[in-house]
From Swiss-Prot:
Biological processes annotated in GO: protein modification process
Site (Lowers pKa of active site Cys): K158
Pathway given in the UniProt record: Protein modification; protein lipoylation via endogenous pathway; protein N(6)-(lipoyl)lysine from octanoyl-[acyl-carrier-protein]: step 1/2
Residues the record lists as binding substrate: R83, G84, G85, Q86, W87, T88, Y89, H90, A161, L162, G163, G174, V175, S176
EC number: 2.3.1.181
Annotated compartments: Cytoplasm
SUPFAM superfamilies reported for this sequence: Class II aaRS and biotin synthetases (SSF55681)
Keywords: Acyltransferase, Cytoplasm, Transferase
Active-site residues, as the UniProt record annotates them: C192 (acyl-thioester intermediate)
Protein name in the entry: Octanoyltransferase
Record organism: Gluconobacter oxydans (strain 621H)
Note: In the reaction, the free carboxyl group of octanoic acid is attached via an amide linkage to the epsilon-amino group of a specific lysine residue of lipoyl domains of lipoate-dependent enzymes.
Cellular component terms (Gene Ontology): cytoplasm
């Protein structure tokens, strides 16, 4: 996957709308909002947006999801997300960063109409964010998402996931980072179709870290990858 370089301060000049929703946003509402926003961005009637949310417990299926990878012992709702990837869990204590951007234009280190570079930029955004919180995270060839060494097990585990959809060169869906979710809820699926590795969270590294800490780090890390300054929507 192509690597993107960090931007210099002189290259950062544009702004991007940034919205954080309190509480738990029902997943179907998020799908509807993202689809409508992506359509409006394509039509030129809305600005690009990064939207930070949490969801009630839910399993979502990407376009490559297999029925055999869903166990769902708690009977959580399941939805077809229409994004790339396989099964993913979302729930309280996990931050979703939905990225709705016009990819026909260059965005910081990401060239126009380059999906591989866009994915690399999102992964870099997550690793840069986690570094600001004292967590060393990395990517692995052939494994989408962001990984780290779980401090409790000493083994590689996923701390951030990624799944996007692109409609008429406008992105929607995005990334997730585990802050303090109930990690046993991930047992209801084979996360992203990968059986060999577990999942972890920020609170396994530092129990004092909060969702607000992550949100601040996400905003601070964004310009270095995508060349725009977050502004409240």
């Amino acid at each position: 996957m192509p690597k993107t370089r960090a931007m210099t301060r002189n290259e950062i000049c544009e702004e991007i709308l940034w919205k954080s929703s309190p509480g738990l946003t029902p997943y179907p509402e998020a799908l509807t909002f993202m689809e409508e926003r992506a359509r409006a961005i394509h039509q030129g009637t809305a600005e690009p947006l990064v939207w930070l949310v949490e969801h009630p417990p839910v399993f979502t299926a990407g376009t490559s999801a297999k029925d055999a990878d869903l166990y769902n012992p708690h009977g959580y709702p399941t939805y077809s997300a229409g994004r790339g990837g396989q099964w993913t869990y979302h729930g309280p204590g996990q931050r979703l960063g939905y990225v709705m951007m016009d990819l026909t234009k260059p965005n910081g280190t990401v060239p126009s109409r380059d999906l591989r570079a866009f994915v690399a930029g999102l992964e870099g955004w997550m690793t840069d964010t986690l570094a600001r919180l004292g967590v060393t995270a990395f990517t692995r060839e052939g494994r989408i998402g962001v990984w780290t060494i779980d401090p409790l097990t000493g083994l590689e585990a996923k701390i951030g996931a990624l799944g996007i959809r692109v409609s008429r060169w406008v992105s929607w869906h995005g990334v997730s980072i585990n802050v303090s979710p109930d990690l046993t809820d991930f047992d209801g699926i084979v996360p992203c179709g990968i059986r060999e590795f577990g999942v972890t969270s920020l609170q396994r590294f530092d129990s004092s870290l909060t969702m607000a800490d992550l949100d601040d780090a996400l905003a601070a890390a964004w310009p270095g990858r995508f060349g725009s300054i977050p502004q409240a929507a």
